[in-house]
Amino acid sequence: MEQAGTRPAATEHPRLRRPMPWLLLLPLLLLLLLLLPGPAASQLRYSVPEEQAPGALVGNVARALGLELRRLGPGCLRINHLGAPSPRYLELDLTSGALFVNERIDREALCEQRPRCLLSLEVLAHNPVAVSAVEVEILDINDNSPRFPRPNYQLQVSESVAPGARFHIESAQDPDVGANSVQTYELSPSEHFELDLKPLQENSKVLELVLRKGLDREQAALHHLVLTAVDGGIPARSGTAQISVRVLDTNDNSPAFDQSTYRVQLREDSPPGTLVVKLNASDPDEGSNGELRYSLSSYTSDRERQLFSIDASTGEVRVIGGLDYEEASSYQIYVQATDRGPVPMAGHCKVLVDIVDVNDNAPEVVLTDLYSPVPENATPNTIVAVLSVNDQDSGPNRKVSLGLEATLPFRLNGFGNSYTLVVSGPLDRERVAVYNITVTATDGGIPQLTSLRTLKVEISDINDNPPSFLEDSYSIYIQENNLPGVLLCTVQATDPDEKENAEVTYSLLEREIQGLPVTSYVSINSASGSLYAVNSFDYEKFREFFVTVEAQDKGNPPLSSTGTANVYVVDMNDHAPHILYPSSTNSSAAFEMGPRTAPAGYLVTKVIAMDSDSGQNAWLFYHLAQTSDLDLFKVELHTGEIRTTRKMGDESGSTFNLTVVVRDNGEPSLSASVAITVAVVDRVSKILPDTQRHVKSPRTYSEITLYLIIALSTVSFIFLLTIIILSIIKCYRYTAYGTACCGGFCGVRERSPAELYKQANNNIDARIPHGLKVQPHFIEVRGNGSLTKTYCYKACLTAGSGSDTFMFYNTGAQTGPGPSGAQAAVTDSRNLTGQSGQNAGNLIILKNEAVSQNEPRQPNPDWRYSASLRAGMHSSVHLEEAGILRAGPGGPDQQWPTVSSATPEPEAGEVSPPVGAGVNSNSWTFKYGPGNPKQSGPGELPDKFIIPGSPAIISIRQEPANSQIDKSDFITFGKKEETKKKKKKKKGNKTQEKKEKGNSTTDNSDQ
């Protein structure tokens, strides 16, 4: 670049221009070499048969071109495939210059049907440069057999085809060319067919099968031929095809009867349907050409046609009308048998019928028209059928009358020899769907002849019946926790209609169950009526519901009806028992306490449990699963009460651990358990509450426990409020009458014994021990001046009282003279002293010396005893207004308080308490008359009763002395005595004694 741009180098220019003429001559020399003839450019031709194995030699290109490969050197030759055939069928050996087969050559695949198959190559040589064209011709060999397009050919040729008819056959194909292609065809020997070959084009021929003799299906119905194609190769190859020629029948034979004339005899009285003769004809053709149909030919007169008929398929000729010898003694019947070919062919015969004379022509009923079915809502006079009658006799015997059964809803209307059958009454398809109406035809001859004709009249349906369920209601019982989609029940409704009027579809009427549509619970298959559960049912949420199923038909208009399916959810044992009391947590057991002096059978506590299930699944059974002392405690199976089996002694431990299992009666059974710690102490008051047991986190309370706490708190508040209100009212009333009672404290009205004695009417005799101090917890006994046998008492109790027994000595009327034989009732020491060990200071003993000694007293029906009330009373007595307080003459050791209502003598003797009765010196006891107390005999009821105390009015009513049943001997609770006292108050007794009695009664009623 630098030299090209420097001009001063002019001295070197002559040396640069010297080689230029030689460079210009080189292209000219190369062009000259290419144009010169000789080994530089040549044309080579080779041929090789197809299907040669790879490596087969085609020719030596180097030798043909006169090239010496040793002088040229390696890589001086190269071959190119013109047209780039793929794959490369030929290759050149660069070391030897030989052209050989590289891959198998299939001429048919490479060149198909072309006459010549050539492969064009180009050989390039270097030093010197030479280009040679090479043509390799692929020679065909006979490697393919001729082949027909189909292996079998089916030809159908009618037997009526004339000889010379041609039938084209497809030619065979051979992929080879030239002499190796198909050259000739051969046909198997046949007397009916031959092969005709016509050239179409080079190496192609047209094949035709030529009929050279007529066909007869009756002789040969099928012909089998073999067509063979042969090529010109060596050895020759061939291919075959099967040709089946089926000969089609033509109606070329006419039917033929066994006889041309048949002769028979027939009685005149032959009824319709009598077989006259059975004809037989035959036809050698096949198919429809051989099927025969019998009929009366046109030569048969109408008279014969009315009397005789022939069965088209069997050829039986039968009588259809009445034969009359007087009219015709013989009949000629012409019968033809016709085949069913395209061009029917017929055969004929004649039947001669000779009538044997008898005189008995019966009328004939002919059904002209029948309009069946008849709709069930057809109106009267609707035409059902049109009938006609015929009698071959003459004169009076020809007159025919028709009749029906009177019970049918049809009647006949006649005009001449024709009758119409019409509707005369209501039709009901559901009751009768088809009527077989028998029409009786009677002629006027002597004797009368009759004939019957039965008409089958069908009644068509209309939609006049709604679907009806098989049951008014369906009861479905399904266990809870069912799987969704379970089949509940299949309801079924029937419709007496038919077809679409009887097709019933089912659906559920819309309604809500617990705020949700019914389809949220139940689904129904509209076609089958099967009810399925959509969801799982829970017995504890709802136990039963009902769905209304509507069944509707598909009539026009549609009719429907409804049915009810009651679904009852059956409880399963899916809830374990829940222990309400006592409750325990995982960290601590329930705590209970009991005194060490508790006897056998002592109630320690009671396990309360509940089960959300029902029925036997909710039956609970209590078991003692574990305890530290197996012999000390037992659990009641059904109540859950835990009691001691023996007395707790000093040898027992201080605490006992128990585990109580509550099990239900389900299958399988579920259970719950609670742990209980029982502490044994000397006194219950010393036991401190377990704060861990009673103080719980609010989260541990269940919803049920919360409801129980609210309910108990509400009840306790109402009860406390009621007690306060009653106490205020009572204090107000006592204050009004001079008696103080405040804040739940019951006091005694301060009166001296002398004052009380002055106001008494000597009906009550009461004695109190010396130095007895009246306590605020008292029993009040009142007596009335006017009603000396009516008393009331009041018991004011404290929470510390442990006695639950009250002894009351009843009074009775005097039944006879002499001293009373009444005695005190005997109670055991436990009843008198109570289980808490207190003395029997709560016992008041009433005495009446006028007690009947003859018979025991029956309980008054007015008495009602409440077991929930206890009369734990201390030894204090308040005798108000009608009582007498006085000391007995016996001194302190024998000063037993006595209450008497019948004996006015204060000097009567006193009886000490019975030995072993558990009554100490500070107790009240009965006062008896002189003498020892009388013991009750076996089976007798004592006149004295021990009755638990109750804050209610106790009335002792005295009946007259001659009364058989002394009702005053018993205690009465209720309002009868109060009603009597109110009536007496209305009578106007205004004395202070009656006022005080009325006030006392009102006070007791408030209690």
UniProtKB/Swiss-Prot annotation:
Ranges occupied by PXXP repeats: 856-859, 889-892, 930-933, 948-951
Ranges in the topological domain labelled Cytoplasmic: 730-1007
Residue ranges, compositional bias (Basic and acidic residues): 966-980
MF terms in GO: calcium ion binding
Glycan-modified residues: 280, 436, 586, 657
Ranges that cross the membrane: 709-729
PROSITE patterns, per database record: CADHERIN_1, CADHERIN_2
Chain intervals for the UniProt region annotation (Disordered): 885-1007
InterPro entries per the UniProt record, alphabetical: Cadherin-like_dom, Cadherin-like_sf, Cadherin_C, Cadherin_CBD, Cadherin_CS, Cadherin_N, Protocadherin/Cadherin-CA
Main location: membrane
Residue ranges of every copy of the Cadherin domain listed in the record: 43-148, 149-257, 258-365, 374-469, 470-579, 594-691
Signal sequence segment: 1-42
Protein topology in the membrane: Single-pass type I membrane protein
Function: Potential calcium-dependent cell-adhesion protein. May be involved in the establishment and maintenance of specific neuronal connections in the brain.
Protein name: Protocadherin alpha-C2
Organism: Pan troglodytes
